[in-house]
């Protein structure tokens, strides 16, 4: 059971920015007054914010409760994905995308940190490989789903964030 829980955290790591990609071409139609800079900020700011929050979460995970940190990261990730379903202003979409980056930054170091904490030797190395595989498989599947959902409505690709993080938040501890 521990292995499945740890693998599931790996599924979230590749998702930041994914929901924006399939709708980039339509954003000029959805937000006709949006500048190119604002649209570029949607993809770059979350990635930029991942870095400091990854470092902060890594530091906090050494001295604090990793589980609580994971729950906070997943909650921020879930809530930002959920909020995107209702946004109709570009500045709000940028702000909430930044929150997605913050949530992901908190989660990312924990995905491998848990493997290092719970496993040793060759088994640890194998688990790190599985984690990477799950990360990439999730990215492929979520990209296909987000692309399909983008054809229905531009808000719907953000469901990818909510579905994965909601699953984690509702699992028994």
Predicted regions, residues:
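Paired small-residue
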Residues: 91-99
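Cytoplasmic helix-loop-helix junction between adjacent transmembrane helices
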Residues: 98-133
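Conserved MFS/SLC helix-loop-helix module at the cytosolic interface between two early adjacent transmembrane helices
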Residues: 52-85
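Extracellular/periplasmic helix-loop-helix junction of adjacent transmembrane segments
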Residues: 24-51
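Conserved small/polar residues in nucleotide/adenosyl-binding loops
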Residues: 167-173
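Symmetry-related core transmembrane helices of the 12-TM Major Facilitator Superfamily/SLC fold
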Residues: 158-166
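Residue-level signature of mid-helix packing/kink "hotspots" within the transmembrane helices
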Residues: 18, 47-55, 139-140
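Extracytoplasmic
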Residues: 2, 8-32
């Amino acid at each position: 059971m521990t292995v499945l829980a740890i693998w599931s955290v790996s599924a979230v790591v590749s998702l930041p920015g994914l929901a924006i990609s399939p709708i980039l071409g339509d954003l000029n139609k959805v937000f006709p007054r949006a500048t190119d800079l604002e649209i570029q900020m949607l993809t770059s700011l979350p990635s930029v914010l991942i870095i400091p929050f990854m470092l902060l979460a890594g530091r906090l995970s050494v001295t604090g409760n990793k589980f609580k940190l994971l729950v906070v990261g997943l909650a921020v990730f879930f809530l930002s994905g959920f909020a995107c379903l209702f946004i109709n202003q570009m500045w709000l979409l940028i702000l909430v995308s930044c929150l997605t980056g913050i949530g992901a930054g908190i989660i990312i170091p924990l995905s491998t940190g848990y493997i290092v904490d719970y496993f040793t030797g060759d088994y640890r190395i194998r688990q790190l490989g599985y984690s990477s595989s799950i990360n990439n498989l999730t990215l492929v599947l979520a990209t296909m789903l987000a692309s399909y959902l983008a054809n229905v409505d531009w808000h719907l690709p953000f469901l990818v964030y909510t579905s994965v993080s909601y699953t984690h938040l509702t699992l028994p501890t």
